[in-house]
Amino acid sequence: MKAVMLLSGGIDSSTLLYYLLDGGYEVHALTFFYGQKHSKEIESAEKVAKAAKVRHLKVDISTIHDLISYGALTGEEEVPKAFYSEEVQRRTIVPNRNMILLSIAAGYAVKIGAKEVHYAAHLSDYSIYPDCRKEFVKALDTAVYLANIWTPVEVRAPFVDMTKADIVRLGLKLGVPYELTWSCYEGGDRPCLSCGTCLERTEAFLANGVKDPLLSDEEWKNAVKIYEEMRARNEGKSD
């Protein structure tokens, strides 16, 4: 069965790709450039798709940037160096992003005869990002069905009840090449290790008792140190 999926180049969507392949799907991966501050994840998506030997399309919709430019990922705000919290996550929201990307993916699915569109929304994103919630998935699935009633397409988020640590655990079993993925909100040569998504990534690999394969031994030691220091500082504030 054909399936279209959103592939960002991060660990969640890369795991989803390998999960779908393991399930016997013919995967068509879409990666979007919508005006992000850097292209590191897009480059990683290309590497992951090549390693998995799947059809991969990079779609430039950057002309919408001025319409949705907001916060730290597409706007002028600096990337916050802190664990995810309601305040931090609100600063990293791209308004209506998944609605836009999944709508395009659904149209592409109809074109190629795919019956499903998948994306890697998960439990760790659930509390703040509105377009990663079960309610959103269900509502968009209904909307896509109504919009394409003669050629029905389902919208699915198979990781919606999983944490990032759960996703990494699955990916390790599936042999996901995490060394090719990119999560950092910064666009440097190496991950900054201290933005919200870097900290969450470190936490996920720590929870599984393994080193992040993207990092050198020295970088991993530094990542764990930063994680533990910022976690202790964060817990101190809540006491």
From Swiss-Prot:
Reaction(s) catalysed (UniProt annotation): 7-carboxy-7-deazaguanine + NH4(+) + ATP = 7-cyano-7-deazaguanine + ADP + phosphate + H2O + H(+)
Needed cofactors: Zn(2+)
Residue numbers binding ATP: L7, S8, G9, G10, I11, D12, S13, S14, T15, L16, L17
Domain of life assignment: Archaea
UniProt KW Nucleotide-binding keyword: yes
N-terminal signal peptide: none
GO molecular function ontology, one term from the record: zinc ion binding
Pfam families named among the record's database cross-references: QueC
Free-text comment on the cofactor: Binds 1 zinc ion per subunit.
Role: Catalyzes the ATP-dependent conversion of 7-carboxy-7-deazaguanine (CDG) to 7-cyano-7-deazaguanine (preQ(0)).
HAMAP family the record matches: QueC
Family statement drawn from the similarity comment of this UniProt entry: Belongs to the QueC family.
Protein's name according to its UniProt entry: 7-cyano-7-deazaguanine synthase
Native source organism of the sequence: Archaeoglobus fulgidus (strain ATCC 49558 / DSM 4304 / JCM 9628 / NBRC 100126 / VC-16)
